[in-house]
Amino acid sequence: MQISQKAQSARAISLVLAGVLLISQAFTAQAVADERDAAAARQIVEKFSQSLVSSVRNDSTTTYKDRFDALLPVFRENFALNILARATVGKRVWEQWSDSEQADYQEVLARFLTGTLVRRVKNDKGYKFSFVGIEPGPRSSLIARTLLERDAKDPIELDYRLDKVGGRWMISDVFAESAVSEVALRRAEFSGTIRSGGQSGLIVALEEKLTAFENDG
């Protein structure tokens, strides 16, 4: 009887230790996955941010179009355009549009948001990008915090939300000074135009803004 109790105790201890080991392995695997996700997200943000900084030149002959043309392909590569497009007009409106209307809007939205970012940095020289860190965001997203430092001026806080799209982390929103969501800002801005002119009216309005951006230099 005594031997049986010892055997049972040993078996119970073995089961507990096995459970602890499995939990430990699960936590380790999750930690490794989290580190890989953070590293991948950081790489995306750093690539775009460095491209944004590089688009600003001290050479006065560099035009808005030069900066725009340099940044647009990097924007398209690293931003989740489908998420951005749907979020900036709202799910109900988005689902009412045809595939071709959605595609046309994504194309002009990419150019409009790129142009907006180019204009934000056009008047300041001496930009320097600093990566602050990454933290978990809502709905399995990640938030990457960065600074755009400027000569003799306060740095600009730029935070990026990233979501996984097709197994790859992509930027789905930008927050200026940790508060102003680019998606929320554009949705509020576009809503009136959509109500009065629909998809075609919004396309025309954005094309007009892009023309004004280029004319302003």
Ranges and model annotations:
Residues 36-43, 54, 58-62, 66, ...:
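Surface-exposed, polar/charged faces of alpha-helical domains
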